[in-house]
């Protein structure tokens, strides 16, 4: 082996698990700020659960015969104690587990929200990743259609806050367990008569989760699915009253919707109301938010019988939609970039930068990239590229005179060039910058 160092193989990220780089992070922060403001306005409280849970939580909560549990979960055995663990594929079951474990419902209903990464072993494509991010709400302890309506209206408010248009609401009712059981018998009998049309996926689901057969995207099966027995025909008085009550509230609040009798969800815990918010601008991955009522789940996971409803939305899909509709906010950059030349100026630059940060300004202090002092020209190029509103300039002359140079970087004069540098007494710098920023903001509003 030669003395020459062997070139190390360049490592890359896991397929379907994406880095969020600085140029993208601003859009994420914009969305997160907007959605958190909306959630606060409805009185929802943040809950944060672990990324890893016991596998049994999802098997019992989501359903053993669902696609998620059968094919999509990242599960492993803990080498230390042999526990079967899973990286969460969704978060409703985990939030319910936490509510039960910590006795959160002892003093009444709770409005909770979460945000974070989820994991599913899928074929990566646009809008569908192996690590993806969701924000969601869980309204625990609310039984009537008013809670269903409120969580739906929260989504509409978020679309309005983000400026998104054309996201459509689809509704359905899955009724109660005994109603679904009666429909299931009729549905299986009907589908058995059309075995020659069913694809392999439908045949696999026929006796385990026949409702999902109706959600097929296979063109050859559309007629069979369309003519299948309708669950709505099996709904009793209680289920119908709940669904009609929801519709009345939505109509009274001018929330348009379409009833989609083939709308089901890929998780077993839903009953009564289910809904999706869909768009035609993202291709096959058109669902941006989905949810419904899951009254049986809390008891199913070991708690007392408690009504509940909620939704989750895919953040990556919403960000794709913001980009598609050109609603990405501009990065405003920082307020001040401090450049300096000479040892005394460097020491003073640190002091000034911290003083400006104390007032709430965002400040970048030039630091050497190669251990050498860069020229003023080079530093000013960095200042321009940073997007800062002003450059604060410190050199030997400024230190000797007790002044600081301030150069506007965004403003232009009548000739289209940058405005000239001002020399300001060091003790007046903060006041000067704040006044200059206020004036710039007022000019921008004109």
Curated annotation (Swiss-Prot):
Highest taxon in the source lineage: Bacteria
Top EC class for this record: ligase
An example Gene Ontology biological process: histidyl-tRNA aminoacylation
Protein name: Histidine--tRNA ligase
Assembly information from the UniProt record: Homodimer.
Family, similarity comment: Belongs to the class-II aminoacyl-tRNA synthetase family.
Species per Swiss-Prot/TrEMBL record: Paraburkholderia xenovorans (strain LB400)
Reactions catalysed, as given in the entry: tRNA(His) + L-histidine + ATP = L-histidyl-tRNA(His) + AMP + diphosphate + H(+)
GO function terms (MF aspect): ATP binding; histidine-tRNA ligase activity
Keyword Protein biosynthesis in record: yes
């Amino acid at each position: 082996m030669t003395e020459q160092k062997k070139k190390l193989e360049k490592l890359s990220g896991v397929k379907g698990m994406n880095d969020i780089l600085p140029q993208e992070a601003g859009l994420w922060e914009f969305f997160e700020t907007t959605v958190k403001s909306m959630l606060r306005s409805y009185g929802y409280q943040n809950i944060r659960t672990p990324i890893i849970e016991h596998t049994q939580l999802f098997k019992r909560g989501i359903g053993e015969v669902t696609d998620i549990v059968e094919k999509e979960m990242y599960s492993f055995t803990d080498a230390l104690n042999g526990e079967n663990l899973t990286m969460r594929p969704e978060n409703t079951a985990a939030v319910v587990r936490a509510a039960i474990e910590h006795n959160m419902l002892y003093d009444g209903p709770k409005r909770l929200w979460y945000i974070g990464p989820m994991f599913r072993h899928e074929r990566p494509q646009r809008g569908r990743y192996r690590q993806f991010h969701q924000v969601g709400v869980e309204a625990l302890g609310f039984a009537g259609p008013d809670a269903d309506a409120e969580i739906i209206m929260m989504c509409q408010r978020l679309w309005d806050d983000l400026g998104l248009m054309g996201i459509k609401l689809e509704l359905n009712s899955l009724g109660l367990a005994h109603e679904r059981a009666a429909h299931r018998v009729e549905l299986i009998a009907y589908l058995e008569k059309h075995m020659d049309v069913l694809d392999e996926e439908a045949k696999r689901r026929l006796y385990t989760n026949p409702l999902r057969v109706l959600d097929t995207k296979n063109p050859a099966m559309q007629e069979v699915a369309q003519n299948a027995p309708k669950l709505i025909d099996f709904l009793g008085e209680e289920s119908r009253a709940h669904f009609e009550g929801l519709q009345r509230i939505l109509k009274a609040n001018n929330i348009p919707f379409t009833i989609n009798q083939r709308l089901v969800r890929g998780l077993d815990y839903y009953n009564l109301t289910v809904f999706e918010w869909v768009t035609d601008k993202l291709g096959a991955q058109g669902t941006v938010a989905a949810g419904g009522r899951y009254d049986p789940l809390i008891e199913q996971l070991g708690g007392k019988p408690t009504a509940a409803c909620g939704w989750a939305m895919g953040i990556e899909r919403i960000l794709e939609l913001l980009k598609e509709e050109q609603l990405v906010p501009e990065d405003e950059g920082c307020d001040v970039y401090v450049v300096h030349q000479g040892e005394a100026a460097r020491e003073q630059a640190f002091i000034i930068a911290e003083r400006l940060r104390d007032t709430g300004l965002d400040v970048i202090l030039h630091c050497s990239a190669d251990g050498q002092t860069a020229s003023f020209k080079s530093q000013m190029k960095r200042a321009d590229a940073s997007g800062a509103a002003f450059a604060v300039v410190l050199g030997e002359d400024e230190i000797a005179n007790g002044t600081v140079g301030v150069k506007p970087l965004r403003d232009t004069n009548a000739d289209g060039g940058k405005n000239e540098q001002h020399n300001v007494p060091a003790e007046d710098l903060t006041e000067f910058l704040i006044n200059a920023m206020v004036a710039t903001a007022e000019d921008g509003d004109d």
